[in-house]
Amino acid sequence: ASAGLDGAAIGMAHRGRLNVLVNSLGKMPKDLFAEFDHTAPEDLPAGDVKYHQGFSSDVTTPGGPVHLSLAFNPSHLEIVNPVVEGSVRARMDRRADPHGKQVLPVLVHGDAAFAGQGVNQETLALAQTRGYYTGGTVHIIINNQIGFTTSDPRDTRSTLYCTDICLLYTSDAAD
């Protein structure tokens, strides 16, 4: 917040999501459990599993308040990524922030999904275009090696690192 950042939009799948809701965004465990117990009021029932629900909160940091939002995530692995990027881009446009200095997109991936889902390459390919630029995205990749059902790691992808798909793209860190 002290550097001018006043928000972050987070996209992630199910693994670790409840932890992020409670420990990073400050959702009260009793509220989370009430959703699972079906005792929490639902204004508009989504019909989706509870751990796919989104949430946002204002978190106090030493530099000031920061608004964090965790995007709703459907059961389609990695599809939340362009949604988060679009949300951040819309906020940039609304705030007249052409360099993306106020809201940070953060995406959390599993290693297999990062390398294996085409939506990631598509999102990366658009990252530097004028209509989709967000100033940069933090990608957190969990190398848990459980995304594929193959027994030999040599059969999971063609490269040593799941992040090697990023070598196709360049970025100007000075922006």
State the predicted function of each range.
Residues 1-158:
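Conserved internal helical-beta-strand scaffold that buttresses enzyme catalytic cores
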Residues 164-168:
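Short helix-loop-beta junction
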